[in-house]
């Protein structure tokens, strides 16, 4: 997992490229949590990704924001999909968000209970039937199947 910060510090594009490349060579899936603004590091990650996943809450404001950014992202990397997190306060459905944004719906999920608390106090421990784990499995299933990882017969991939 590679993530930046919201506090003005920008990741270096070379560092992002090195992490993604090392992950691929090591045979692991690399997940990059990208900011909303396009930076050199963001561009590097988007260029390298086998799949770009936009995660959106299921509400009108988020739908509008997703609809705005989707065409920009698709010019950088056409392998784009959507995960919608609900529930919707007004009855909007995940499929409607995907249709409006013009993106394929990879997964929809309800909010993961106690997610922030788990992350702040020792890390994420998901049960296999949790909303986040189920959505993650659906997204990972979209990625191309692994080829040959050094020592294990599988290859790495960036997401």
Predicted features, each with a name:
Residues 3-4, 31-33, 53-58, 81-86:
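Conserved beta-strand segments of the P-loop GTPase G domain that flank and frequently precede/overlap
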Residues 27, 36-60:
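Inter-motif core of Ras-like GTPase G domains
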Residues 75-159:
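C-terminal lobe/tail of nucleotide-utilizing enzymes
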């Amino acid at each position: 997992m590679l993530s930046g910060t919201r506090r003005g510090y920008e990741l270096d594009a070379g560092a992002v490229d090195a992490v993604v490349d090392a992950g691929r060579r090591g045979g692991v899936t690399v997940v990059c949590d990208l900011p909303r603004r396009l930076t050199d590091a963001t561009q590097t990650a988007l260029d390298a990704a086998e799949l770009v996943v936009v995660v959106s809450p299921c509400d009108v404001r988020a739908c509008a924001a997703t609809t705005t950014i989707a065409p920009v992202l698709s010019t950088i990397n056409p392998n784009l999909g959507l995960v919608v997190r609900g529930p919707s306060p007004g009855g909007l459905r995940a499929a409607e968000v995907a249709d409006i944004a013009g993106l394929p719906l990879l997964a929809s999920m309800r909010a993961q209970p106690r997610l922030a608390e788990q992350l702040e106090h020792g890390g994420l421990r998901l049960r296999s039937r949790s909303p986040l784990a189920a959505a993650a499995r659906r997204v990972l299933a979209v990625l191309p199947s692994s080829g040959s990882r050094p020592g294990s017969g599988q290859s790495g991939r960036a997401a």
